[in-house]
């Protein structure tokens, strides 16, 4: 319980920082990391995907505390909203996959009667998450026009889902590197060596 409370508190603070970065308030608040030219908020993490993963852990901590009834429901709901909002701001595709896995696992737990969280609450939070992902680009543009503030631009879900496919090419190239030396490899921490050698005969 103590660990869940710490994770929830730090996750909520992380979410608040991410929201401030989205609104470009980070440049005016002492002690907060200035995003500068970064597009996706990352709060006190160096990378948006890392932040999103931690925020999902915080959400799971929130569910645990709800099940144990250690914190009032309205407090947990407020924290959950901040966490979900920040996850949507991160535009992390990793979080989309994680949410899908958690939903499947949660549905199984509900079927077995191991958790008391109602299925319609879960669907409501999922709908909120999807709605935030869909509406954030519109909200970002509107806030920028109304306030004349250059806030961090967010991409649409379609752009995030289909954009930057270069990662797949890199994975394909690394697969060829593994097939070239399946037994002895390239040595500890020698990924760059593998990349250089495979580039001679396979361009990713």
Sequence positions of predicted segments:
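Flexible juxtamembrane loops connecting transmembrane helices in multi-pass membrane enzymes
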Residues: 40-44, 102, 133-173, 196
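TM-adjacent membrane-interface loops and short helices in multi-pass inner/ER membrane proteins
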Residues: 47, 159, 166-204
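Surface-exposed loop/turn and secondary-structure junction residues enriched for glycine/proline
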Residues: 32-35, 45-48, 54, 146-154, ...
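Alpha-helical transmembrane segments of multi-pass inner-membrane proteins
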Residues: 1-142, 194
